[in-house]
UniProtKB/Swiss-Prot annotation:
Lipid attachment in record (S-diacylglycerol cysteine): C22
Signal peptide: 1-21
Coiled coil: none
Keywords: Cell membrane, Lipoprotein, Membrane, Palmitate, Signal
Domain of life from the UniProt record: Bacteria
One Pfam family of this chain: Rick_17kDa_Anti
UniProt KW Transmembrane helix keyword: no
GO cellular component: cell outer membrane; plasma membrane
Protein name: Uncharacterized lipoprotein YfgH
InterPro entries: Bact_OM_lipoprot/Surf_antigen (IPR051407), Gly_zipper_2TM_dom (IPR008816)
This protein's record includes keyword Cell membrane: yes
C-alpha cells in the first residue's frame, strides 16, 4: 500500500498542473498581432479618437487545449494505472493491464473537464470616426489604451484593429 501512495501523489500533482495549464491566453487575437500573410501588405489605416475604454471578457476557442489535455490525461492515467495495477496485483500482467486501461480512461475523462471556450481579458473601445461613434471589442488590457488619438488598421472587410496607444506599467 505504501508503494501505491508514493506513486499516486506525484502522478496526481503532475496531471493537475498539466491540466490547469491547458487554458488559452488568446494573445494571438490581440489587435497588434499579425499572421505572416498580413506582413508587408498595404492595409487601410485611419486615426480615430477613443472616448471610452471599458473592461470586457472575450470567449475564445480552447478546443485544441481540451484535446491535448484528454490525450495527455489518458497517457499519464495509463502509466499511473499500470504502475498501480502492477503493485496492487502483485506484479501480475492482468493487474498491470487492468490498471493501465482504467487509468487511461480516468485520465481522458479528467482531460475532458477542460472547457471548449475560455474567457480572456478584453476591452470595449468606444471611438469617434468623423462624426460617427462606434464600439469595437477586442482582446487586450485596459492599460494598453488611453482616451485620445489611436490608429485603426483594417486588414479585412469590417475588421477594426485599434492599436494600443499606450503601454502597461512594467512589472518589477
Amino acid at each position: 500500500m505504501m508503494k501505491f501512495k508514493k506513486c499516486l501523489l506525484p502522478v496526481a500533482m503532475l496531471a493537475s498542473f498539466t491540466l490547469a495549464g491547458c487554458q488559452s491566453n488568446a494573445d494571438d487575437h490581440a489587435a497588434d498581432v499579425y499572421q505572416t500573410d498580413q506582413l508587408n501588405t498595404k492595409q487601410e489605416t485611419k486615426t480615430v479618437n477613443i472616448i471610452s475604454i471599458l473592461p470586457a471578457k472575450v470567449a475564445v476557442d480552447n478546443s485544441q487545449n481540451k484535446r491535448n489535455a484528454q490525450a495527455f490525461g489518458a497517457l499519464i492515467g495509463a502509466v499511473a494505472g499500470g504502475v498501480i495495477g502492477h503493485n496492487v496485483g502483485s506484479g501480475s500482467n492482468s493487474g498491470t493491464t487492468a490498471g493501465a486501461v482504467g487509468g487511461g480512461a480516468v485520465g481522458a475523462a479528467a482531460g475532458s473537464m477542460v472547457n471548449d471556450k475560455t474567457l480572456v481579458e478584453g476591452v470595449s473601445l468606444t471611438y469617434k470616426e468623423g462624426t460617427k461613434v462606434y464600439t469595437s471589442t477586442q482582446v487586450g488590457k485596459e492599460c494598453q489604451f488611453t482616451t485620445g488619438l489611436a490608429v485603426v488598421i483594417t486588414t479585412t472587410y469590417n475588421e477594426t484593429r485599434i492599436q494600443p496607444n499606450t503601454k502597461c506599467p512594467e512589472k518589477s
